Amino acid sequence: MNPNQKIITIGSICMVVGIISLILQIGNIISIWISHSIQTGNQNHTGICNQGIITYNVVAGQDSTSVILTGNSSLCPIRGWAIHSKDNGIRIGSKGDVFVIREPFISCSHLECRTFFLTQGALLNDKHSNGTVKDRSPYRALMSCPVGEAPSPYNSRFESVAWSASACHDGMGWLTIGISGPDNGAVAVLKYNGIITETIKSWRKKILRTQESECTCVNGSCFTIMTDGPSNGLASYKIFKIEKGKVTKSIELNAPNSHYEECSCYPDTGKVMCVCRDNWHGSNRPWVSFDQNLDYQIGYICSGVFGDNPRPKDGPGSCGPVSADGANGVKGFSYRYGNGVWIGRTKSDSSRHGFEMIWDPNGWTETDSRFSVRQDVVAMTDRSGYSGSFVQHPELTGLDCMRPCFWVELIRGRPEEETIWTSGSIISFCGVNSDTVDWSWPDGAELPFTIDK
């Protein structure tokens, strides 16, 4: 083969290899394009199977499963309380990025439970945590994270600018209520699935405030209670009925000898029961029960096992306010079972220390101080704080009843400890009809932090 023939042969081979390579590249590009078109095309697909038509509605980035939480079930029968969650937020925050918070609470949809909390716009062990003992500031916000996780910038979702708040799920979306603004003109901003739907202006111009725990949803409507007026005297109390973020009805309670703040509410057989804080003149807790038309009844827990703090030693109770040590108070809760009542309270009668659950089988209607069950969850030597109720609907648990649960805030820092900040962690428990245990689940953080020295 002469040199010219060699050149022609080599050139021909190179040309064939090049053409094959080009065809393969074109095929690869076509394959990628087809695959991409399938993934990003119309997300409403209709398929035919055995002559039946099935339509799939795919919602990108969002779970499209929805139900209506009816709230028609009665509370589950229980014998005690099982530990549900503990976030250890202060302990983790000594080294990690954890928000300075207070007023945490828990609320559950039919799919998950979330911890909601009011941040101070600051992290633990950072200079901006200085002075966070203050309740109301423009830096506070309602945020949420998965239950049991320490609240950090990496796992938390912004909900609303707020220094007082509530939130609940109706089975189709989250309702959040965030109150912010000056003491003499605060505004509650209502959001449904993150979109502003309504606002409520302070009507007494004296620190509009709400529950600091979950609102309550029944048959697609959600209910909350707000207070406006003095914390040490008669104020104004309103119940709001809300549907998909819009107020459809409201009433003002006629309660001239009662004081309702920071109510802990739950659904029970289609009605709503709220147990609240009397900061005016009661060491027992006031309650209000209402139906979906906002027809209501009011009263006080009669038991001589008193639920507020400060409070007198247990003794003769009253179905009206017990005035001994009745001034001031702390957010709390109870669960009614017929004539009986589970009472959650601090173990100390003069400070926010310890926590216990007490079953008084006649305490809703009788004034004696006899009880049959006491379960300790935080020791007297450890700090506690606010507490509140939340429920797990049958749509979440698969039970045929409403599971009662509660949370306890574990406050740390100022004014009791030598720190520049005030924050808290949270523990929670749910009612079970099986074995439980007495123990203490304290916050457990070793103070002071580096920033405090």
From Swiss-Prot:
Residues 75-453 are annotated as: Head of neuraminidase. GO terms for biological process: carbohydrate metabolic process; viral budding from plasma membrane. Substrate binds at R102, R136, E261, E262, R277, R352. It holds the Pfam family Neur. Keywords: Calcium, Disulfide bond, Glycoprotein, Glycosidase, Host cell membrane, Host membrane, Hydrolase, Membrane, Metal-binding, Signal-anchor, Transmembrane, Transmembrane helix, Virion. Changing V133S: In strain: A/NWS/33. Its EC number is 3.2.1.18. N-glycosylated. Its cofactor is Ca(2+). Glycans are attached at N44, N72, N130, N219. Residues 36-74 are annotated as: Hypervariable stalk region. Inhibited by the neuraminidase inhibitors zanamivir (Relenza) and oseltamivir (Tamiflu). These drugs interfere with the release of progeny virus from infected cells and are effective against all influenza strains. Resistance to neuraminidase inhibitors is quite rare. Ca(2+) binds at D278, G282, D308, N328. Belongs to the glycosyl hydrolase 34 family. This is Neuraminidase. It comes from Influenza A virus (strain A/Wilson-Smith/1933 H1N1) (Influenza A virus (strain A/WS/1933 H1N1)).
